[in-house]
A protein has these predicted regions:
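Conserved pre-motif I regulatory segment
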Residues: 1-43
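A substrate-engagement module of RecA-like helicase motors
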Residues: 1-14, 47, 64-190, 283-286
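Walker A/P-loop NTP-binding motif
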Residues: 32-33, 52-65, 82-87
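Signature of the SF2 helicase/ATPase Hel1-core->accessory helical subdomain module
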Residues: 61, 77, 82-85, 163-164, ...
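Conserved RecA-like ASCE P-loop NTPase motor core of nucleic-acid helicases/translocases
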Residues: 66-72, 372-374, 444-451, 575-576
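A contiguous, basic/glycine-rich beta-loop/short-helix subdomain that forms a polymer-engagement track
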Residues: 157-190, 205-207, 304-419, 426-433, ...
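Conserved RecA-like P-loop NTPase helicase motor core
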Residues: 416-426, 471, 476-580
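Conserved helicase motor "Helicase C" RecA-like lobe of SF1/SF2 P-loop NTPases
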Residues: 451-475
């Protein structure tokens, strides 16, 4: 493998524009060693290292069966269509690679047979159904990702099934099942690409979902704790209860059995009563206690429904088990303690473990295959101790390789001198004025990452009409469509929050200014964050130093990483939060970021961009 990453090596011969990077070769060597010795590895690779090829090449060279688990579908597609073919060509390996997704991503032939399109409303779903007709006749995979016009969640739910609704071998369409076909192909593959959620479902199922494998690479590993918490937690939602009732009615019709109308009505009424009893005014609200009486009544109603369905045939037996599983989720919300947190949402009741480390240690790290964790942000401070502690990964080597980019030449960090405290009422308005001024200096070409949806709305209202650039806003179009427009319309501005802090890759001039309004501390009152801070205190730690600060540092590094995506990129990161300068922990944030010049005068930004004329705020 030594010559693959060198000048004139296999990758240079495969990719005409390949640039050898010592950091990529070092990362590949560390991964090769881990695979050879069967050791877990936590590897941080700075932006631009080319981490995908750095793990794919040693994975293919090892001859082992490897699973790659990602957090996003975009990375799955990139691996399948771009990176794996390059790695295979460079290593001379004839590799069988398959992407495997959860069942709900595949068309269900049985659901399709019973679908009644005349019930579709006019508009988007009607158009989506019409557009699907040719695809239904020609698709070989049934994968929703093939569709050019995205159906709504409600429409796709009518045409697909999750694992809790699948009849398995009892289904008359089992031999032609798209999901089973995908699993069969994955069982024969050398390399299987999945997402974090499906890998954790594999662990939860007693290793029954994926083929046996020697190693797993967790790419985008900075998101593993949240993925694991979601897997280990549960929820009871208004939509889920309605879906259960819908499936019961449909299965009864198909089996020519009487619909248990009384039991279904009671589940609907008691579910609605519980959800209304805990509903927050907005967002998420932590529940120190779930009202026991409405919860117990809903559990009883679900038990009665399960009893009414039991023994009525295989499909109704499956729905009986699903009803009991829903009752178990409600019961879990009642059993709160130091290790579990529950919260309410406008349409759901949810719970999650506060700490996933013990479960991951026992079920994955101690008993599972060799694990390689890769991300651009796994160290908070000098090492990956924080992330390893959160994940329960006690025995693992660490590798840290920096970015090949020249940040002192390519980037400028701007922290304005006179911003108010971010917790004050005047901050959002002052930040909006600063954003408008900066957009004048950068000629648009900006991504603005906000701390909340409220701030997003305020900046949208303030910026539109004050700058001569197209202003794109998260929520006004699907994520990928927004990113496509942002890349194509070079002087456009994208305002976003939440998921846009990571996984956004916009090389070139379209992203020349990155604005971050506040240091990304979790919002006060976030149930899971609050419970984790309390758990740290109970264990004798300091909630801020040992959890809140390193978590925010990792998030800020993710946001910063959106700016420089290539050797030719140049740009400014503007962080409008004065705490970066005024609080002692500001030095920790600055030390965590790539080294580059820091300025507090907008004249430095103007000079960086070539003295463009500012737009009046």
């Amino acid at each position: 493998m030594e010559d693959v990453f060198t000048a004139g090596g296999a990758l240079s011969r495969t990719l005409p524009d390949y640039e050898p990077r010592p950091e990529q070769a070092a990362l590949a060597a560390a991964i090769d060693r881990a695979l050879s010795l069967g050791e877990h590895l936590v590897a941080e690779a700075g932006t631009g290292v080319g981490k995908s090829l750095a793990y794919l090449v040693p994975a293919l060279e090892s001859g082992q069966r490897v699973v790659v688990a990602t957090a996003t579908k975009a990375l799955q597609q990139q691996l399948l269509t771009k990176d794996v073919p390059v790695a295979a060509a460079a290593t001379g390996r004839d590799v069988d690679v398959q992407v495997l997704k959860g069942r709900a991503n595949y068309l269900c032939r049985r659901q399709l047979q019973g679908f009644q399109p005349f019930l579709l409303p006019d508009g988007r779903d009607g158009a989506a159904w019409e557009a699907m007709q040719g695809w239904l006749d020609t698709t070989e995979t049934g994968d929703r990702a093939e569709l050019e016009l995205e159906p709504s969640a409600a429409l796709w739910a009518e045409l697909s099934v999750g694992p809790d609704r699948c009849s398995g071998r009892r289904c008359p369409f089992f031999s032609a099942c798209f999901a089973e076909g995908a699993r069969a192909r994955a069982a024969e593959a050398d390399l299987v690409i999945v997402n974090h959620a499906l890998y954790f479902a594999h662990v939860a199922s007693g290793l029954a979902v994926l083929p046996e494998h020697d190693a797993v690479v967790f790419d985008e590993a900075h998101r593993l704790e949240e993925s694991a918490a979601s897997w280990l937690g549960g929820r009871v939602s208004r939509q889920g209860l309605r879906r259960l009732a819908h499936d019961v009615e449909r299965a009864c019709r198909e089996a020519q059995r009487p619909v248990p109308a009384r039991e279904l009505d009671r589940v609907e009424r008691t579910g609605e009563r519980l959800l209304r009893a805990v509903a927050p005014p907005a967002g998420r609200r932590r529940l120190r206690e779930v009202p026991p009486e409405p919860a117990l009544v809903l559990m009883d109603a679900l038990g009665d429904l399960a009893a009414a369905l039991h023994g009525q045939g295989e499909d109704l037996d499956a729905l009986s088990r699903r009803s009991l599983a829903a009752a178990t989720e409600v019961e879990a919300c009642l059993e709160l303690g130091p290790g579990r947190v529950a919260w309410s949402e406008p349409d759901a009741l949810a719970w999650a473990p506060v700490d996933v480390s013990a479960e991951l240690r026992e079920r994955l790290w101690d008993e599972g295959p060799t694990a390689i964790l890769v991300s651009a942000t796994l160290t908070a401070g000098d090492d990956a101790a924080f992330v390893r502690r959160r994940l329960g990964l006690d025995r693992a080597r660490e590798a840290v390789v920096g970015s090949p980019y020249d940040f002192p030449e390519q980037a400028l960090l701007y922290v304005p001198r006179t911003m108010p405290d971010p917790r004050s009422d005047g901050f959002t308005g002052r930040a909006a004025d600063e954003i408008v001024s900066l957009l004048g200096l950068s000629a648009g070409r900006a991504l603005v990452l906000t701390s909340s949806y409220r701030a997003l709305d305020a900046y949208r209202d303030h910026v539109r009409g004050r700058v001569p650039y197209e202003v794109l806003v998260q929520g006004e179009a699907p994520r990928e469509r927004l990113l496509e427009r942002f890349r194509a319309e070079v002087d456009s501005v994208l305002l976003a929050t939440s998921t846009f802090w990571q996984g956004v890759d916009v090389p070139g001039e379209s992203l020349s200014l990155l604005v971050i309004d506040k240091l990304p501390f979790s919002a006060p009152g976030d149930p899971l964050h609050e419970a984790r801070c309390e758990a740290v205190e109970l264990q004798g730690g300091d909630w801020f130093r040992d959890y809140a600060l390193p978590t925010a540092m990792l998030q800020l590094r993710q946001g910063f990483g959106r700016l420089i995506r290539g050797h030719a990129d140049r740009g400014v990161v503007a962080i409008l939060d004065p705490r970066l300068r005024t609080r002692p922990y500001g030095r920790a944030f600055l030390a965590a970021l790539p080294r580059c010049p820091v300025a507090e005068d907008p004249a430095a930004v103007a000079a960086f961009f070539g003295d463009r004329v500012a737009v009046s705020a």
